[in-house]
Amino acid sequence: AVGNGLVVRQQDRSVLEPYLVDGEVDLSALLAATDRKVGVVAERSYGEFIDNILHQAPSGALTPHYGNDALTNLLSMQRLGRLQVVLGYWPEIRYQARQAQIAENELEFYPIRGNGKYLSGYVACSDTTQGRQAISEINQLLRTLPHEHLNQLYAAWLDPERQADYLEQARAFFERQAAQ
């Protein structure tokens, strides 16, 4: 899956420019040096790398939003100019923006430096005989699924610029997994 990143409105791109390194945002520097708040879904894990940065963020650097529609509400706050930067998972942001009738070309996504372009998903179960058996069966199933079709379905949610790279990276990933 595409990694989490920061999204801004096109008109607010300059907010991130001082923190860009090779097209990626230095999130630690942004949180430490700016009076602008970053909108986050409260109590969500963004992965170990980003979570560590968020836990070290200065007081008041984040605007956490709670509830089932937290991301949609953050995007609405952004659209109204109350918030300039939102942290999230790009396909989810694209979907929620579409639902809120925010045109995709109004938003610009920036990856976070050091986070990695793609994320692996994980399944966890309780550490019991049944849980270990479930994980074993899930792992076996994942190795034999027809990934090509699933990868195409996922890629359809990505912006056109990311689709080809994702499909190539996913193909290589699953080939490596099958060889193990």
Task: Describe these PLM feature segments.
Residues 1-3, 102-139, 164:
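Periplasmic-binding protein-like
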Residues 1-47:
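A conserved helix-loop-strand patch within extracytoplasmic ligand-binding domains
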Residues 25-34, 41-52, 105, 139-180:
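Ligand-binding clefts/hinges and TM-proximal coupling segments of bilobed small-molecule sensing domains
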Residues 37-39, 86, 124:
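Short, well-ordered beta-strand segments
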Residues 43, 67-71, 86, 90, ...:
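Solvent-exposed, acidic/flexible segments
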Residues 50-57, 96-101:
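Short, aromatic/basic amphipathic alpha-helical patches
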Residues 54-69, 82, 106-108:
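A local structural motif
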Residues 70-94, 99-100:
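Short helices/loops that flank or line small-molecule/ion binding pockets
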